[in-house]
Amino acid sequence: MGKYVLRRLLMTILVVLVASVVVFTLVYFVPGDPVKILMSPESTVAELEAKRHSLGLDRPYLVQLGNFLYNAYIKFDLGTSWIRGTSVVEGLAERLPYTFQLGVLAILVSSLIGIPLGINAAVHQNCWQDRVCMLIGMVCTSVPDFWIALLMIVLFSQKLNWLPAFGVGGITYLIMPVIAASLKSIGTLARQTRSSMLEVIRSDYVTTARAKGLKERSVIYKHMLPNALIPIITVIGGSFSGIIAGTVVIEQVFSRPGVGTYLTQAITNRDFPIIRGCVIILAIFTSVMMLLVDLAYAVVDPRIKAQYAGQSRKRSHKHGGNPHHRHHHHHDHGGHDHHDHCEESEKGERKDG
C-alpha cells in the first residue's frame, strides 16, 4: 500500500505542476497590459517600461514560467501581490482557515442530512417517503447557492434581524454561509446514497440478516450501508472539493475574508500573482482530497486494501463470502413490485419498533 500512496503522491505532484503551467499560460496570454492598471493614467512610457521590467514582465514566456515554477516549488514563494505589495503565501495563510472552516462545516451538514435522506428513500422505495426525500434532494440541487444566500440575507438578516449578514465572528456568522454552501451537496448525496443502497438492498447477505431476525435498523446500518459506502465516499470527496471551489461565490455574498474573496478581488484588479497562488492551492487541495478518497476505500473495503498491498485478485477472491461483492444483486430479484416493497418496509419498521 505504501507503494500505491507514493505513486499517487507523485501523480498529485504532476497534476499540480500541469495545473500551474496551464494557469500561468492562461494568465500570461490574457489580453491587455496589467502594468497600465497598476500605474496611473499620467504615467510616461519610460515609467511603464520601468515598472514592467521590475515585475519581470519584459522577459520571454519560458523564462517567466521557469522562474515562477522555481520560486513556487523550490523556494515555496508564490510571489508578491502587485496591488497590495504583500506576500501571496502570507495572504493565503491568513484566509485559508476561514475557507476551510466553511468547507468542513458545509460537508458535515451535507453528510448528516443527505445520507439519512438517501437511506430513508431507499428503504421506502417508491413509497411516499421516497418521493418526499427525493423531492427535497431535487430542490437542494436545483436552487442556485448565490440565490438562496441572498434570500436568507433578506429574510433572516434584514427582515427578521435574527442573523448577521456579513463578516466573521461567532457561530451565528456561519449559519447562513454553511446552509448556502451545503445545499447542492445535500441533494447530490441523497441521490447517490439512495442509488447505492438500492444496489445492496436485495443482496443475499441482507436477506440472510433479516432471516436471522435482526432488527431493521441493524440490517440497514450494519449490513447495507457499509457495503454502499464506496460511491458515497466518492461523492463526499468531490463535494468537499466543489464546496471549497464554490466559496468564491459564497464568501463574496457574505463578505467573508477567505480565499474566494481574495481570488475574486485579484481577478478584478488583474493581480496575477494572487490568481496563480489561489489556483495552485485549489489544485493541491483537490488532488489531496482525491488521494484521501482512494485511501478511504481501503478502510471500508478490505478487497481494495488487499489490492493496494499487492495481493493477487485470485487470492482476494479465495476468501469469498465477503459481503462487499454486492454489485447489481438487486437486478436478479425482479419479482417484487412497488407495493410489495412498501409493505416490506412497513413490516420492517414495525419489527424494529
Where are the model-predicted features located?
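Hydrophobic alpha-helical segments of integral membrane proteins
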Residues: 9, 51, 55-73, 77, ...
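Histidine-centered metal-binding segments
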Residues: 313-353
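Alpha-helical transmembrane segments of integral membrane proteins
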Residues: 2-3, 94-129, 168-314
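Membrane-water interface segments at the C-terminal ends of transmembrane alpha-helices
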Residues: 22-23, 27-29, 68, 72, ...
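N-terminal signal-anchor/signal peptide hydrophobic helix marking the start
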Residues: 6-16
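Hydrophobic alpha-helical transmembrane segments of membrane transport/permease proteins
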Residues: 15-66, 160-176
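Residue-level signal for discrete positions within transmembrane alpha-helices
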Residues: 12, 95, 99, 135-142, ...
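An internal, D/E-rich "acidic patch" concept
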Residues: 58-115
